Structure formats: structure tokens, C-alpha cells
Regions:
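Positively charged, amphipathic and often flexible ligand-engagement surfaces
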Residues: 196-208
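Catalytic alpha-helical scaffold of carbohydrate-active enzymes acting on polysaccharides/glycoconjugates
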Residues: 1-146, 151-194, 214-236, 243-280
Length: 280
């Protein structure tokens, strides 16, 4: 039986995410699974991100369901104290590499990126990405070849920027239906950076949407069946502050099910991109 590629994408958006990485790495070591970690660089403005929900009555229910207390004292980052995400704990980022996982870049200044990307031109976006690459390399020494836009925020200017900077692949799209890796089209030409989409909402997002544990497990199983039938790479993603900090038991169960399913072969996103380029 032909195996379907499967990947675990971990988004590190804040210092709180960094603080929970050791627990996540222990789990991955136990399961013998390699993951791709997309690390945000620049200032941690978590307090501003939470504040926008408090000041918007329409978002209050979503805010409560998101379990804001999961961030603990890190909720003050960006308001009462300054913290750089990539320097919050350099040792744990080095451990990611030491244990054979992949590190990619998740933008620079996560809060400002999501808030302002749509108004940025290509030059400004390239400047921010270059700042991020420099910051992450200074801590890890890694040659960063993969990218993931915070909030799955995409513009034509952004696509041109990652193309110009020569990334091997990027993961900037999410679809609840099978979507093969693809090369997007800008208004002027086809992009040369392969996109590897995420396959479904995270566990945390599904909880906020009202799903129960059993419904999330059922949705995961159904999606695995559909993606395998289509032979499309199955990519799940998580945030340590959510899946590790709040839903560790369910998250562990989901990863174990995926690891033990003989229909799937665990790969990093870089490995999926490499294999797909050979295929096409």
C-alpha cells in the first residue's frame, strides 16, 4: 500500500509557547516523530493580542473559550515587559535541532504582522523577513529554508517577497478539503516557492468552535481517511500554549493515532516539499 505523507507543524508564536516546548519535545521523543517548528521572531506582544478580544464585545465568547489564562504571566508580554520570542530560551530551540526536528521562520513581530501585512509593500515585507532570518540564525545557527506566514495571512506582495528571498517552500494556506502542494499565481507570474498547505483547524481552534473531545477525534479520523484516499499530504498544526498547555491528553492521543496508522509516513514539511518537487 502506498503511504501518504503526514506532518506535524508546530507554530511558536510567543514566549509562552517557547516555555512549553520541552514538554512537547518529550512527547515527540516518546512517539519517535519528527516535527516542523515555525518560530516567530521579534517582540512578543501577547498582551496586545489578548487586549483586542477584551475590547471587542463580539469576540468576548471566543476569547473566553480560548482559555486566556493558559498564558499565565506571559500575558503581560508587550505591555508591562519586553520579551523577544527567539531569545526567551535559546537552549530549547537548539534542542529542537539536536533531536532532528526542522526549524522554519514564522515571521517577525507576530502581532504587527497579522495586523499590518495587507498594507505592506514587497520591500517592507522582505525587510521584516530578513530581520527574522537574522534573529533566528543568531540563536540557532540554522540555515532556514521554510516559512509560514502568521495567521495564514497572504498577499501578492508577500508571495513576491518569499519568492525573491529564495525559500524552498512555505506553508501559508489552510484548507478543510484536500489540497495538494502547489505553486501559487501572483498577478504577474507563477511563484517559484512551493506551498504546503495545512489540512485542518488545530485542536484549540476546534474547541473554540464548540467541538467536544470525541467530535475532534472523529473529525481527525474522517479527514485522515479522505486525505489518504486522495493521496494528499496530511498536515496538522498546533500551538504549544493551546495543545500542550490545555489539551495535552487529547493532543497526545491524536499524535499517537497518526503515528500508528500504517497508511501514513511521518515526514517534516521540508521532506514533503522535497518529495513533491521530485514528483512534479
Amino acid at each position: 500500500m502506498l503511504e501518504t505523507p503526514a506532518a506535524i507543524r508546530i507554530d511558536v508564536d510567543s514566549a509562552r509557547d517557547v516555555a512549553l516546548l520541552p514538554e512537547l519535545l518529550d512527547l515527540l521523543l516518546l512517539l519517535d516523530v519528527k516535527a516542523t517548528f515555525f518560530v516567530t521572531t521579534g517582540p512578543d506582544r501577547l498582551a496586545l493580542n489578548l487586549f483586542k478580544y477584551i475590547t471587542n464585545p463580539r469576540s468576548s465568547i471566543r476569547f473566553i473559550k480560548s482559555k486566556p489564562l493558559r498564558y499565565g504571566s506571559h500575558s503581560l508580554n508587550g505591555l508591562l515587559r519586553k520579551t523577544q520570542v527567539e531569545t526567551a530560551c535559546p537552549e530549547v530551540l537548539l534542542r529542537i535541532l539536536k533531536e532532528g526536528h526542522e526549524i522554519g521562520l514564522h515571521g517577525y513581530d507576530h502581532y504587527a504582522w497579522i495586523r499590518n501585512l495587507r498594507s505592506m509593500d514587497e520591500t517592507r515585507i522582505k525587510e521584516l523577513i530578513s530581520n527574522g532570518l537574522e534573529a533566528l540564525k543568531a540563536v540557532t545557527g540554522a540555515d532556514i529554508r521554510g516559512f509560514a506566514s502568521p495567521g495564514f495571512t497572504v498577499t501578492n506582495a508577500f508571495l513576491r517577497a518569499i519568492d525573491a528571498l529564495g525559500f524552498d517552500y512555505s506553508s501559508d494556506f489552510k484548507s478543510n478539503k484536500p489540497m495538494s502542494p502547489f505553486y501559487p499565481q501572483t498577478e504577474t507570474k507563477g511563484d517559484s516557492v512551493l506551498q504546503v498547505p495545512v489540512s485542518m483547524d488545530s485542536i484549540g481552534e476546534l474547541f473554540i468552535a464548540g467541538y467536544s473531545d470525541s467530535q475532534i477525534k472523529a473529525k481527525m479520523c474522517k479527514n485522515m481517511d479522505v486525505w489518504h484516499a486522495k493521496r494528499v499530504p496530511f498536515v496538522i498544526y498546533a500551538h504549544p500554549a493551546h495543545e500542550v498547555g490545555c489539551y495535552m491528553e487529547l493532543f497526545s492521543s491524536v499524535l499517537r493515532d497518526l503515528r500508528e496508522d500504517s497508511r501514513f509516513i511521518p515526514l517534516t514539511l521540508a521532506q514533503i516539499a522535497q518529495k513533491w518537487k521530485v514528483r512534479v
